[in-house]
């Protein structure tokens, strides 16, 4: 009788054990193993790069307020509504029209914290962004300029801002991830870097 009792208890124990999930392992950073998560504060972002859908979506998914420029008015407006961004139509991707679009965004939002631009426009856009921000009532303590291009452009130093270059070879998601990385508050010390995506 005692043997039968122990067998039944062991079967109940084995059935309960099979139904239980393994304990959830946590890494030292507090995340699940194999997952790295960052807290990304809500930022105001201007993307002045043609065909930067992956970058726009990455910042929208991170909870940022995003404005982007484009020449296709109907397609740009539809895309903006789909991802939750603001579309600013421009006639062409030249420094003058992009700076005017950036001024409109700055007037509406009162500040732009992150600027994503191409290497060819970087000097003009960065200079215009600095001018717009210098007119703010309080000096901003955070700012990022991320330059995307096939080759790096020379950019003058910017106080209280980080400038990084990403040299891309048609790898949209890799470029978008690098842009998010450089825009993190913890990456303020990373300055003047060139990242080549292979």
Which sequence ranges carry the predicted segments?
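Rossmann-fold scaffold of SDR-type NAD(P)-dependent oxidoreductases
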Residues: 47-48, 69, 112-124, 144-149, ...
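Hydrophobic anchor residue in the Rossmann-like NAD(P) cofactor-binding loop of oxidoreductases
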Residues: 92
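N-terminal intrinsically disordered, low-complexity tails
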Residues: 7-30
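Helix N-cap at the beta1-alpha1 junction of Rossmann-like dinucleotide-binding domains, i.e.
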Residues: 72-75, 170
């Amino acid at each position: 009788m005692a043997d039968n009792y122990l067998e039944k208890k062991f079967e109940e124990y084995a059935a309960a054990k099979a139904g239980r999930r393994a304990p959830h392992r946590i890494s030292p950073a507090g995340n699940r193993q194999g997952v790295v998560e960052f807290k990304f504060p809500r930022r105001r972002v201007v993307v002045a790069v043609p065909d930067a859908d992956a970058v726009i979506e990455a910042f929208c998914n991170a909870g940022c307020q995003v404005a982007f420029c484009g020449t296709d008015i109907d397609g740009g407006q539809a895309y903006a509504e789909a991802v939750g961004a603001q579309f600013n139509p421009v006639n062409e991707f030249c420094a003058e029209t992009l700076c005017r679009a950036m001024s409109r965004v700055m007037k509406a939002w009162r500040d732009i914290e992150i600027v994503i631009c191409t290497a060819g426009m970087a000097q003009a856009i960065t200079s215009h962004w600095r001018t717009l921000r210098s007119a703010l009532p309080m000096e901003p303590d955070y700012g990022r300029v991320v330059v995307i291009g096939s080759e790096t452009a020379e950019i003058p130093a910017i106080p209280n801002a980080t400038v990084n270059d990403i040299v891309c070879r048609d790898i949209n998601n890799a470029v978008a991830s690098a842009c998010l990385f450089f825009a993190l508050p913890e990456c303020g010390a990373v300055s003047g870097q060139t990242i080549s995506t292979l």
